[in-house]
């Protein structure tokens, strides 16, 4: 099992190219189920989760082929409507094949999903929304069995709380449902806008993109299209924290300030200079960090996928800060590992109190999930001495070429292969 070794204390200086967004690429790949024609995708990151999605789509008869650097061609006729446990368990986004399979074939059998071990993250809203559109659903032996013997129809669906996954599920499905579907209190994340843009290129009729009210008018069929995946705002935010925690300065080439949402202003409050420029976003920190509170919220609020990284930054800030997690439970699993490196963090329910320390010390640590894994890398970059991050397969699910990108900016980092 691979590990990453870091010798900390070096400011990051240089340019980091931001990859395509994992959380968009996976969903846009699923859109390939909605047509027999080919979907040509550009700026696709080379990640373990992308490979897993390609494996899942192949299970359904959809071929995913590399056509060039960061380019994929997705397409084919559906030959199988079952998504098996051994693939679905690896990645939560796998659940999104349910609606498209149902819309195209009238039936689907999909295992309940896996992914990071972050709380329960139920799929109730997915299933209730599909039922409102005419689906018949039963749970049996860890599988979702869905049928639509009379086809799917439009519906007005109001989410009781914002759900990115449920919004994506019903957005994909409604493109081929008869009539009009309205999603009220829909998630507004940039990746959802990117998915909607791709679907419209394929012939869908979606309006309200970027708002919390999406209107989808079903069409008879979708066709192939070419689409470029938007830059990964989580990767950009993560490297912004890397520049800040090392006291360096980097250009995040391709990053978009708007997509960072509340993270940009929160970093500013903490003493980090975040500036939009023609090529992307620059991030620098020449003076001290200040303890700053953060509460995770749906976009454009502070994104939950940056909570662990920002907490690491606050671990070396002057003063105290409180980080509150409102999206997922059980998302503080990185705290004991950070404390092993000298951080002073106490968890109280859904909040963590972070009391800044002058510095961290290198130590062997264990990654527990995707974003937590990079929080430990950040700690290693700032720490005195050597840090070994174990279980970096979590990291490979969502970050492309981590060692290369960091080393190019001056980090002393290498991958150890067992």
UniProtKB/Swiss-Prot annotation:
GO biological process, one term: peptidoglycan biosynthetic process
Subcellular location: Cytoplasm
Stated name of the protein: UDP-N-acetylglucosamine 1-carboxyvinyltransferase
UniProt main location, coarse: cytoplasm
Positions with a binding annotation for UDP-N-acetyl-alpha-D-glucosamine: 92, 121-125, 305, 327
Protein family according to the UniProt entry: Belongs to the EPSP synthase family. MurA subfamily.
Record carries keyword Cytoplasm: yes
Lineage: Bacteria, Pseudomonadati, Pseudomonadota, Alphaproteobacteria, Acetobacterales
Catalytic activity as recorded in UniProt: phosphoenolpyruvate + UDP-N-acetyl-alpha-D-glucosamine = UDP-N-acetyl-3-O-(1-carboxyvinyl)-alpha-D-glucosamine + phosphate
InterPro entries linked: Enolpyruvate_Tfrase_dom, Enolpyruvate_Tfrase_sf, MurA_subfamily, RNA3'P_cycl/enolpyr_Trfase_a/b, UDP_GlcNAc_COvinyl_MurA
One GO location term (cellular component): cytoplasm
Superkingdom field: Bacteria
Functional summary from the UniProt entry: Cell wall formation. Adds enolpyruvyl to UDP-N-acetylglucosamine.
Keyword field: Cell cycle, Cell division, Cell shape, Cell wall biogenesis/degradation, Cytoplasm, Peptidoglycan synthesis, Pyruvate, Transferase
Residues annotated to bind phosphoenolpyruvate: 22-23
Molecular function via GO: UDP-N-acetylglucosamine 1-carboxyvinyltransferase activity
Entry EC no(s): 2.5.1.7
Gene that produces this protein: murA
Metabolic or biological pathway: Cell wall biogenesis; peptidoglycan biosynthesis
